[in-house]
């Protein structure tokens, strides 16, 4: 009897999900099927989603409920279909390139870097002093693409090759006769510096100083002796960051002083046709390239030619591409552009597509030919410079890189998200040096009447902006998360009346409501135990009566004393409910002879 009583006490005091069939309140247990069904019906009737309340409506017939249920399923399928179309469009083309609504000033952009190369790569007077059987002559012939002795296995350093090129090429002070910028004549040596390109030694204007362009810069990179420039201060500039806020009065690279020929760059060049020895073209004159100040030029393939004896006008239009910071969250393979801090180059400090392609070409040559061409980035300080014996290998690699049809390609060099390029057009006319011809150009007289008065050897170039404003293009998100969310929410609201509050409702009915119901049941069970705690002293008389009647059957166990019940009368429930609770708490199951015999009654509980 005691074991049975303790077992029933544990069963009645558990807070699990088992339902006690003898308790009216336990029928509301949260884990019961009936409770779950009632919760689902309650949600359907009170949900903000369209059509669900008709499924749970009891006043309509079952076919009508089925109709609304199928309609709701169809609406969900249509919503998923249209949302998937929006997602495919969002994931396939997340970037849109649009014209900026705000115009930019050319004065906020650097004037383009201009590289000018004489088509003659070696002066005849300098070559005559080199022995025809020497290694230097063979290297020179390799530079001129005239073969040379390809049996010579040249193993030299970049410093040695640089010395040969500087020695035989036309220096900038001999090529540049006159320079003016911003309507002011200036010393050409202050404006132009020597630079090595794929066309040999050239003269460059307005490029970044090598200390801002190259990592691990040293004086070995310099081609000429540095001369102090007390007027212009060298500063850093990148397409992404632009100029610093506080700029000196005179700085380099320079910005445009205005529009038109007078405010642009004007140079007078001397071709020195009598000194021509070798050239990569079939004409005499100059090859010119307009490029970004933060990039090294490749003049051989991309420069335009101005023949000697011609005057050229070259109007320039800047083309600037920027990007919004929001596209950083998009994968690189999707947006197809890189920010400056996302792909550091080994040799250059500033990332651009052309700088990346130069490094890529150097790496491929080093891998395939075990050497690097003299004008390419020296990614390996110990790598040798390619000589005449490497021409066959270097030509093959460069052809494959430019064709982009083989494994030797630089497809991973994506454009920068911020890039500045320049669009230049060329128009030329013949120079007339007849003294009877009255020229309107504000050029010095000594150019036409001095030692370089031969008009057939002179070229005049004018670089200038046509306008001081331009429009840039901006890369931005075509579909940001906000746009995707609004499109999705619009479709769900159109088909189902869905909103953020619908999500809150679902969360409430799955988590908050079951928790609150379970907590309420536990509190109700706890109060019930407190109400029945007064029956504990009453059990002793009953047990003594059981021991006295151990020999017979206890038909009706004696009830507790009436005086013990009197003080707890305020806690009693309804009479019938209290009788059943009292009988279960006593844990005494009477032995009955007939199955239909009624439970014992306690009249004083009324």
Swiss-Prot record:
Q: Gene for this protein?
A: ppk28
* Species lineage: Eukaryota, Metazoa, Ecdysozoa, Arthropoda, Hexapoda
Give me the Gene Ontology terms describing cellular component. Answer: membrane; plasma membrane
Main function = Osmosensitive ion channel that mediates the cellular and behavioral response to water. Plays an essential role in gustatory water reception. Part of a complex that plays a role in tracheal liquid clearance. Probable role in sodium transport.
Tissue occurrence: Expressed in water-sensing neurons in taste bristles on the proboscis but not in carbonation-sensing taste peg neurons (at protein level). Expressed in the tracheal system.
Q: What is its main location?
A: membrane
Its membrane topology is listed as: Multi-pass membrane protein
List the protein's name.
Pickpocket protein 28
Report the gene knockout effect.
Flies do not exhibit any general drinking defects, but do exhibit markedly reduced water-elicited proboscis extension reflex responses. Abolishes water-elicited spiking activity of water gustatory neurons.
Instruction: Please tell me the species this chain comes from.
Output: Drosophila melanogaster
Q: State whether keyword Translocase applies.
A: no
Residue numbers spanned by region Disordered: 1-26
Give TM regions. Answer: 66-86, 490-510
One annotated GO molecular function: ligand-gated sodium channel activity
Domain of life according to the entry = Eukaryota
